[in-house]
């Protein structure tokens, strides 16, 4: 996404690193870093929030791993990650986490003559492609899923993330659930030892590399596929149904997320049941310090998140993200008041 935001003091163009800056005449602009998955909606929210409140926001779309490192190092007010931190790591680093949005990860392909949503894949076949066991697009396993589609003999060019990525975590978490070979040989994390393929930095890098590579395949958050006019695949889900990526299919997966019953809101939503469920769904969590050094900046950040939960729903919907239910938002705000404090008082003063 190409987007320029200007103010009297700064004119920054978003490029490969996808850093957007909204400048405001306040002592402490909001600052965050991490997930590329949430970046498209963060960018839109930031635009509107600037117009509504005059408060600036700087968010670096550098991947979940980078966001975790920066918030721990206190170089930003908040981090964003698509892989929730463990209870032990949250406690060790004095952090709290809460979900911001949910959405879908889609396989993207560059196949001449194949339109978005025409190709069908499943988890086992996707794992075999990323293991390097399936190497051409006319392989019998792919043809079996696409009997009415004429597939070329083009070599498959695998593209994966080169940076620490929550998108990679959820993608590989899904493959682990569908492929014993993948589980044994590769596993799931924000960064893995890829058996084959080339790495690209960020979702932007994956999207651009696939777009430029004949026979390419990669994985990105759905908004990147739409915004870059990339061909994406349908998927065979846990119920054995072929489904398209959409707000509805992501919502079906999200409906299984029991955030209320999960400590630290730690819920993974890959390969969930249901006829209409998209199988590679994911959430993004915000990470923020319990006892922040800059209470004012943290308070402003929490105001922004509260605004996004309430007034950012339509923007999220337009980009095919699923909003966090109001009942869960109430729990999140209660956790802010209980857990994020300075001088013995809650940093968040909202409702």
Swiss-Prot record:
UniProt signal peptide: 1-27
Q: Give the coiled coil ranges.
A: none
- Lineage per the UniProt record: Bacteria, Pseudomonadati, Pseudomonadota, Alphaproteobacteria, Hyphomicrobiales
> So what does this one do?
Part of the ABC transporter complex PstSACB involved in phosphate import.
An example GO BP is: phosphate ion transmembrane transport
Q: Which GO terms describe its molecular function?
A: phosphate ion binding
Alphabetic keyword roster? Periplasm, Phosphate transport, Signal, Transport
Transferase listed as a keyword: no
What InterPro entries does the database record attribute to this sequence? ABC_phos-bd_PstS, PBP_domain, Phosphate-bind_PstS
Where do the annotations place phosphate binding?
35-37, 64, 82, 165-167
Please give the name of this protein.
Phosphate-binding protein PstS
Question: Can you tell which superkingdom this protein's organism belongs to?
Answer: Bacteria
Biological source species: Mesorhizobium japonicum (strain LMG 29417 / CECT 9101 / MAFF 303099)
Q: Where in the cell is it found?
A: Periplasm
Q: How does it assemble?
A: The complex is composed of two ATP-binding proteins (PstB), two transmembrane proteins (PstC and PstA) and a solute-binding protein (PstS).
GO cellular component annotations of the record: ATP-binding cassette (ABC) transporter complex; periplasmic space
Family named by the database record: Belongs to the PstS family.
């Amino acid at each position: 996404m190409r987007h320029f935001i200007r103010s009297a003091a700064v004119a920054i163009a978003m490029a490969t690193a996808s850093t957007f800056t909204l400048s405001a005449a306040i002592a402490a602009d909001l600052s965050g870093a991490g997930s590329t998955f949430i970046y498209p909606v963060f960018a839109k929210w930031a635009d509107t929030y600037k117009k509504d409140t005059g408060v600036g926001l700087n968010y670096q779309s550098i991947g979940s791993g980078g966001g975790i490192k920066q918030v721990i190092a206190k170089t930003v007010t908040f981090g964003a990650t698509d892989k929730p931190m463990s209870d032990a790591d949250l406690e060790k680093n004095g952090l709290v986490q809460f979900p911001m949005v949910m959405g879908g990860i889609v396989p993207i392909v560059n196949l001449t003559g194949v339109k978005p949503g025409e190709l069908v894949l499943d988890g086992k076949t996707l794992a075999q492609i990323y293991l390097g066991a399936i190497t051409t697009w006319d392989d019998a396993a792919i043809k079996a899923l696409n009997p009415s589609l004429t597939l070329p003999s083009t070599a498959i060019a695998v593209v994966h993330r080169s940076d620490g990525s929550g998108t990679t975590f959820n993608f590989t978490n899904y493959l682990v659930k569908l492929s014993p070979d993948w589980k044994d040989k590769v596993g799931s994390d924000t960064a893995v030892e890829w058996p084959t393929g080339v790495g690209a930095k960020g979702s932007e890098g994956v999207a651009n590399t696939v777009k430029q590579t004949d026979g390419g395949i990669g994985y990105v958050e759905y908004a990147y596929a739409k915004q870059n006019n990339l061909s994406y695949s349908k998927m065979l889900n846990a119920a054995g149904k072929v489904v398209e990526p959409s707000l509805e299919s992501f919502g079906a997966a999200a409906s299984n997320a029991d955030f209320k019953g999960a400590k630290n809101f730690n819920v993974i939503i890959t390969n969930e049941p249901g006829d209409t469920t998209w199988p590679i769904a994911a959430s993004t969590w915000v990470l923020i310090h319990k006892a922040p050094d800059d209470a004012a900046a943290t308070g402003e950040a929490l105001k922004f998140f509260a605004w996004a939960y309430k007034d950012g729903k339509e923007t999220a919907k337009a980009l095919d993200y699923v909003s966090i239910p109001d009942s869960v938002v109430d729990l999140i705000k209660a956790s802010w008041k209980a857990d994020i404090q300075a001088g013995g008082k809650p940093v968040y003063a909202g409702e």
